[in-house]
Amino acid sequence: MSVTVKRIIDSTVIVPKLPANEDPVEYPADYFRKSKEIPLYINTTKSLSDLRGYVYQGLKSGNVSIIHVNSYLYGALKDIRGKLDKDWSSFGINIGKAGDTIGIFDLVSVKALDGVLPDGVSDASRTSADDKWLPLYLLGLYRVGRTQMPEYRKKLMDGLTNQCKMINEQFEPLVPEGRDIFDVWGNDSNYTKIVAAVDMFFHMFKKHECASFRYGTIVSRFKDCAALATFGHLCKITGMSTEDVTTWILNREVADEMVQMMLPGQEIDKADSYMPYLIDFGLSSKSPYSSVKNPAFHFWGQLTALLLRSTRARNARQPDDIEYTSLTTAGLLYAYAVGSSADLAQQFCVGDNKYTPDDSTGGLTTNAPPQGRDVVEWLGWFEDQNRKPTPDMMQYAKRAVMSLQGLREKTIGKYAKSEFDK
């Protein structure tokens, strides 16, 4: 129901609205309600031998076709199999039964790609031995191409080279340093579906002899799910359950985004689901779990984690156009509550030698903060402080950030440093 606003001078009634300039989020379960398959379009008109040469020479010349890459990957990987030790299903799709032997492309529905296959340069010197490392290299370039930071990019490329050399000692990189022809491969939906299928398969068969192919594909898992990762990180850094962490959400925007992320039926907590690959499988064009669609939650969670001395949180992206003041206060209060209390209790005993706390002793002075992590107690105390951070809270935050150095712009670490280390 729309809320109307009345102009005082002449009683004109208006209904304030903002332009709908953002696409709505798309959930993976909705995709499978409309379709029971994930189509993968592959050209299968050329032999694996031809495709191997096309890809090898194309990489060396800097003129490789993504259609050749996809067709080669399909040809080289389609016979890789794994035997299930349990039933495997996701979103009502029966992938396989316990005891079944399945392949990577049983996760998708392979269809013929229409059109003429681009020309390629053959290379008769390439053999089936290349199929042990060339797929790893092609899939690894996906991970390298996702980052634009030169130092990290070089680190990933060096790691990929080492992975390939473990299979073939004579391996030499086919793409010269500085060439970025593979950066755009991530825009090809068939390539990303292969990446997702490979990672999902080897996530199930972690001990498979070809599981090292995940070096490049692992970033496909939970792609565009940064806010969901923030939630998991916050649970770990606080040592609190998902339920207890949720009770510490004190801002309407954060609560709205939490409701958005926790929509039932999405298989978030099912490890062998299609859900972690919702972007690369094309199940969603707008992830409900990204930091872009959950900026307030992401900021609040990462700021709290940073104030609890998380090294990972320092480089988390700082969102734009959010209500920083309230979110900062909420994060500070939560971090202060966790950082000021130790969740200690005897876990084992010998015989009956157990410590029993005496709840009848002690008590709080007027301004003393609570000793536990109960959000109700902390909110009551915060009300007594006129809902403003106390000097001790500000000192706590300053101690948490004062040693941070080399911070990048537009990061949570940079924001917290400027906010608390004054």
UniProtKB/Swiss-Prot annotation:
Protein localization: Virion; Host cytoplasm
Membrane spanning stretches: none
Gene3D superfamilies per the UniProt record, alphabetical: Nucleoprotein, Rhabdovirus nucleocapsid protein like domain
Superkingdom: Viruses
Keywords annotated in UniProt: Capsid protein, Helical capsid protein, Host cytoplasm, Ribonucleoprotein, RNA-binding, Viral nucleoprotein, Virion
Main location: virion
Entry similarity comment: Belongs to the vesiculovirus nucleocapsid protein family.
Its job: Encapsidates the genome in a ratio of one N per nine ribonucleotides, protecting it from nucleases. The encapsidated genomic RNA is termed the NC and serves as template for transcription and replication. The nucleocapsid is bullet-shaped with the tip containing 8 turns of a conical spiral before reaching the helical cylindrical trunk. Nucleocapsid assembly is concomitant with replication, therefore viral replication depends on the intracellular concentration of free N, termed N(0). All replicative products are resistant to nucleases.
Name of the molecule in the record: Nucleoprotein
